[in-house]
Curated annotation (Swiss-Prot):
Keyword Cytoplasm: yes
Natural source organism: Hahella chejuensis (strain KCTC 2396)
Reaction equations catalysed: 5-[(5-phospho-1-deoxy-D-ribulos-1-ylimino)methylamino]-1-(5-phospho-beta-D-ribosyl)imidazole-4-carboxamide + L-glutamine = D-erythro-1-(imidazol-4-yl)glycerol 3-phosphate + 5-amino-1-(5-phospho-beta-D-ribosyl)imidazole-4-carboxamide + L-glutamate + H(+)
Protein name: Imidazole glycerol phosphate synthase subunit HisF
Record-level GO BP terms: L-histidine biosynthetic process
Pathway of action: Amino-acid biosynthesis; L-histidine biosynthesis; L-histidine from 5-phospho-alpha-D-ribose 1-diphosphate: step 5/9
General function of this protein: IGPS catalyzes the conversion of PRFAR and glutamine to IGP, AICAR and glutamate. The HisF subunit catalyzes the cyclization activity that produces IGP and AICAR from PRFAR using the ammonia provided by the HisH subunit.
Amino-acid biosynthesis found in the keyword field: yes
Gene: hisF
Length: 257
C-alpha cells in the first residue's frame, strides 16, 4: 500500500472571515476561521489549508493573529498562504504555528525565492500554489496557463512546465487549482491534475471543483493526486470529513480513518 491519501479542507479567508466563491468571485460567508478549522480537526481532517485570498491582490500581509489563534486550537498540519513574498514572511508564519507555507504570486515573479525558501526552511514546508486555466481551443492538445493575483492576471506560463520548474527549485508539494472548476462543483480538471501529477516527483494536491464525494475519489484514482482539497462541500454541511473518508475507503482509496 502507498501513503494514505489526504483530505484537506480549505479555508479561503477574506478580512478575517471564511468565504467561498465561484471561480474566485461571488463570495458567501462561511464563518470564523478558528471555529471552522477546529471543527475540521475534530472531524478527522488530515490537514487544513488557510489562504488569505485578499493578501496578494491588495498587497496586505497574511493575518498572523488569526494563524496564531488557529494553531493554538488545531493539532493537524496547517498550511498558510496569501501574501508570502519574502523569507521573513515565511519565518513569521512558521513562528505563528504554521507547518507549511504556500507561495503563489511571489513564485511567478521571483522563482529563485522558492529555492531560497527551501534552502532556508526545508522543502517539506514549502508548497507552491498554481492557479491554472485551460487556454487550448477544442481539438487542440490541452494546455493550461498560470494566473496570479487570485486568478486575475495571466502570465503566459505553461502550468505543467512551471510545476516541474518549481519542484527543481525546491517545492516540496504542489497545490494545483483549476480556475475553470473553482466552486463550480462539477469535479476536478482531471486531465490537468493527471498531467501535473505525472510531471513531478512531489505530492500534488488537487483543488477546484469538488461537488460530491465521487469527485474526491476521481481526483486520486484518475487524477493521480496525493491529496484532495475541498471547501464548499464541507463548509456548508453537505458532507462531513468522516463521510468523505468512509466513501473513499469503500472505493478502495487508502485514507487515515
Amino acid at each position: 500500500m502507498g501513503l494514505a491519501k489526504r483530505i484537506i479542507p480549505c479555508l479561503d479567508v477574506d478580512k478575517g472571515r471564511v468565504v467561498k466563491g465561484v471561480q474566485f468571485v461571488d463570495i458567501r460567508d462561511a464563518g470564523d476561521p478558528v471555529e471552522v478549522a477546529k471543527r475540521y480537526d475534530e472531524q478527522g481532517a488530515d490537514e487544513i489549508t488557510f489562504l488569505d485570498i485578499t493578501a496578494s491582490h491588495e498587497g496586505r500581509d497574511t493575518t498572523v493573529h488569526t494563524v496564531e489563534r488557529m494553531a493554538s486550537q488545531v493539532f493537524i498540519p496547517l498550511t498558510v498562504g496569501g501574501g508570502i513574498r519574502k523569507l521573513e514572511d515565511i519565518r513569521t508564519m512558521l513562528n505563528a504555528g504554521a507547518d507549511k507555507v504556500s507561495i503563489n504570486t511571489a513564485a511567478v515573479f521571483t522563482p529563485e525565492f522558492v529555492g531560497e525558501a527551501a534552502a532556508r526552511f526545508g522543502s517539506q514546508c514549502i508548497v507552491v500554489a498554481i492557479d491554472a486555466k485551460k487556454v487550448s481551443a477544442p481539438g487542440e492538445e490541452e494546455r493550461w496557463e498560470i494566473f496570479t493575483h487570485g486568478g486575475r492576471k495571466p502570465t503566459g506560463l505553461d502550468a505543467i512546465v512551471w510545476a516541474r520548474k518549481m519542484v527543481e527549485f525546491g517545492a516540496g508539494e504542489i497545490l494545483l487549482t483549476s480556475m475553470d472548476r473553482d466552486g463550480a462543483k462539477n469535479g476536478f480538471d482531471l486531465a490537468l491534475t493527471r498531467a501535473v501529477s505525472d510531471a513531478v516527483s512531489v505530492p500534488v494536491i488537487a483543488s477546484g471543483g469538488v461537488g460530491n464525494l465521487q469527485h474526491l475519489v476521481d481526483g486520486v484514482k484518475e487524477g493521480g493526486a496525493d491529496a484532495v482539497l475541498a471547501a464548499s462541500i464541507f463548509h456548508f454541511g453537505e458532507y462531513s470529513i468522516p463521510e468523505a473518508k468512509a466513501f473513499m475507503a469503500k472505493q478502495g482509496v487508502e485514507v487515515r480513518i
